[in-house]
Regions:
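PP2C/PPM-type serine/threonine phosphatase catalytic domain
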Residues: 1-275
Length: 275
């Protein structure tokens, strides 16, 4: 069962930035009668040019805790913080810190929050193995680094003694330009789909971002259920000395955001050609 968010590719408020971001998302939770919402969460805040994903750590289920409640509250609080900042530009680190401070349920979660600044730069914070990639001209130009202590043990926000605080977050700034495509996702995508296939499935930008997110998520699910496909997680497992083949069945959240030339107040497209 898939949960398609409302596509937010509608025109945004005029801004001084040379670029703007239009985003859509698709979520495929693992099939579970006990936890039908899964353990992933996300938000899209178009007016603030900000998106975020979180992945609740499933090991909490062994203690009777639904980590999805943690990730959902974390993203809800992050969006609320972003909205409170929107007038002066969103600081993703503040959004993450505010979200952590306001999340008061048991559990832990990875998290990634990203905003497009007024100078056309992606500013992001990332904790754990969720993250984002920038697709440019048919290939992955940049991918956020994974934070983990060992194979399949990512950094994670939480209150437990084994959990992390927002200060551990990687702080990332990357210049983007019109035509770039941001793919933000939980590890349900990146564990299963190679970078080359991500870029191929993104295509040339003809489809709405929510449709591209759906395509990526469904491909990840297909690979996740395979036992003989060479996958990123299988490669990483073997590097760690663990025999592993095929994909990893998991919740899958994908947000796709198109970077576009922004229009000024008169409707004129503002394009910085550089030098």
């Amino acid at each position: 069962m898939g949960f398609l968010t409302s596509n937010t590719a509608a025109p945004l408020q005029p801004r001084r930035s040379p670029t703007t971001m239009a985003a859509g998302a698709f979520y495929l939770p693992k099939e579970s009668k006990k936890r039908p919402l899964g353990e992933d969460a996300h938000f899209i805040f178009p007016e603030g040019q900000t998106i975020g994903v979180a992945d609740g750590v499933g090991a909490w289920s062994f203690h009777g805790v639904d980590a999805g409640k943690y990730s959902r509250m974390l993203m809800s609080k992050a969006e609320a913080s972003a909205r409170s900042q929107a007038g002066g530009g969103v600081n993703p680190m503040k959004a993450l810190t505010d979200a952590y401070a306001g999340t008061n349920v048991l559990g832990s979660s990875t998290a990634c929050i990203l905003t497009l600044t007024d100078d056309g730069v992606i500013s992001a914070v990332n904790v754990g193995d969720s993250g984002f990639a920038i697709v440019r001209a048919g290939s992955v130009e940049y991918k956020s680094p994974v934070q983990q202590r060992e194979f399949n043990y990512p950094f994670q926000l939480g209150r437990g003694i084994w959990s992390d605080r927002p200060a551990v977050a990687a702080r990332i700034k990357v210049e983007v330009r019109p035509g770039d495509v941001i793919v933000m996702a939980t590890d349900g995508l990146f564990d299963n789909v190679k970078d080359e296939l991500v870029a191929e499935l993104v295509g040339g930008g003809a489809d709405a971002p929510g449709k591209v997110a759906e395509r990526l998520a469904k491909e990840a699910l297909k690979i996740a259920k395979s036992k003989d496909v060479e996958t990123p997680i299988a490669l990483e497992a073997r590097k760690a000395g663990i025999e592993y083949s095929g994909g990893k069945y998991d919740d899958i959240t994908v947000i796709v955001a198109y970077i576009e030339a922004a229009a000024d107040q008169s409707g004129t497209i503002a394009v910085n050609l550089g030098t």
